[in-house]
Amino acid sequence: IPDERNPFYTLPYFVIEPPVLSEKQEEYSDSKLDEFEISEAIHFSNGGGVYKAISSIDGSQLVIKEGRPEAGIDAMGRDAYTRVEHEGKILEQLKQCSNVVGYREIFKEWEHIFLVEEYVEGMSLQQWVASNYPFESNDQEEYAMKAMKLLENLKHAIEEIHSCGVGIGDLQPANIIIQKNLSIKLIDFEVADNIECEQPTGLMTI
C-alpha cells in the first residue's frame, strides 16, 4: 500500500467510505480552509502539519501551521494547539518588525487551530552555510564578508524584536531564513515570550 503523504484526506483505492463519514464531510463542507489551496506538506508531526498554500482570495503564497489539542506535548506541558495559538499572538505583536515572518491571521477549524503566515523565499542559515562553505582557500575572503553581513543583519533583527518586548526563545540556524540579498527573516516563534519572562522554554536552543 503506497504511503501517500498528501496534505489532504486520501482513501486507499480498495476502501469504500462509510455513509456516516460522507454525511459528516458534507456537514463540514463550508470551511475557512476552502480559502486556501494546499500545494505541499512541508512537515508532519502528531502535533499538526505545516503546509504551503496559495490564497484563493489574492493569490499570495502562504504557510499554514496547524496545532492539534492534547498532542505534541512539550517539556512545559503545553500542547501544539496552545503553542500555535501563542505564536499567533507573538507574530501579531511583531507585525512592524521587517525581519520577522509576516503574520496574516489565525483561525479555528473543528478542534484544530491554524496560523497563516507569509511564505518566505530563501534557505535556512543551516543550508546557507552548507552551500557556501569555502572549501577552496581563495573563497575564504568572500565567505567571511558575507558571513559578517549576515551577522550584522541578524544582530539588527534581534535588537528590533527585543525593542518590541519579545524574547525569541528558539534562535537556531533552521529558523533563520537567508534571502537573495543576504537579508534575513526569522520564523518559528512558538516559544517566544515577554522579554522579561523567566520561565524556561522547554527547548534545548537559545
What are the language-model segments listed below?
Residues 39-40, 46-85:
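ATP-binding glycine-rich loop module of kinase domains
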Residues 150-151:
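Activation segment signature within eukaryotic-like protein kinase domains
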Residues 188-193:
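Activation of the activation-loop gatekeeper triad in protein kinase-fold domains
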Residues 162-173, 178:
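Catalytic-loop of the protein kinase fold
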Residues 1-39:
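Juxta-kinase regulatory segment immediately upstream of eukaryotic protein kinase catalytic domains
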Residues 102-113:
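Short beta-strand micro-motifs within the conserved protein kinase catalytic domain, predominantly
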Residues 89-98:
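Structural motif at the C-terminus of the N-lobe alphaC helix and the adjacent alphaC-beta4 loop
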